[in-house]
């Protein structure tokens, strides 16, 4: 139903990809036509930011229902879109508050040991999306969330990949993950840096 946009995993991710692409290429796009940016931003507001505030999707959490990586993965992507393209401070604040609540629900599901119950591959859509969420919230609030990096649970979430690393490209495998989880990126390094864990 085009009159009631649904934010699911890939709607949120597509929104974030478009938000970042247009932000990075805005000068080049404006040289072609100023209408490109306007159309993309209009769609981002209609399909992502407005329904995010107006609706409650299951992955946002309610403090009772169990959450999974959708919660923080979608939250990260909606926040990225808002951080880049929402100019109204009141709307931006409302999105931030709702996102922070979802992040709390997500964290409540994590054990104190920081283990990702979906395995090392999904950690990138769980623990690392939490890292991105904190970074975006810090960017939107002049680093109001920086103290989170000193919380033991957050530090343990950051250390998860190094704790389950077996050797070379192999990780201790469980759930529906492969033993070869793929190459690490800058996010693992930066999460380690923020939590002061040199082994990362």
Where are each of the predicted segments found?
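Active-site lining segments of carbohydrate-active enzymes
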Residues: 2-121
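Amphipathic alpha-helical protein-interaction segments enriched in hydrophobic
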Residues: 120-128
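Carbohydrate-active enzyme catalytic cores, enriched for enzymes
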Residues: 127-200
């Amino acid at each position: 139903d085009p009159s009631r946009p649904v934010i699911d995993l890939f709607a949120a991710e597509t929104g974030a990809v478009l938000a970042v692409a247009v932000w990075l290429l805005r000068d080049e796009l404006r040289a072609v036509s100023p209408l490109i940016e306007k159309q993309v931003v209009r769609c981002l507001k209609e399909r992502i930011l407005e329904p995010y505030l107006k609706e409650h999707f299951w992955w946002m959490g309610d403090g009772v229902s169990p959450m999974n990586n959708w919660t923080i993965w979608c939250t990260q992507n909606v926040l990225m879109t808002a951080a880049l393209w929402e100019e109204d401070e009141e709307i931006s604040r409302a999105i931030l508050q709702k996102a922070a609540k979802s992040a709390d629900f997500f964290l409540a599901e994590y054990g104190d040991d920081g283990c990702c119950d979906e395995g090392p591959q999904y950690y990138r859509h769980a623990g690392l999306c939490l890292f991105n969420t904190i970074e975006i919230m810090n960017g939107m609030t002049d680093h109001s969330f920086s103290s989170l990096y000193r919380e033991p649970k957050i530090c343990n979430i950051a250390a998860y990949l190094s704790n389950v690393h077996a050797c070379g490209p192999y990780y201790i495998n469980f759930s529906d993950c492969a033993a070869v989880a793929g190459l690490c990126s800058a996010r693992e390094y930066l999460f380690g840096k923020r939590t002061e864990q040199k082994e990362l």
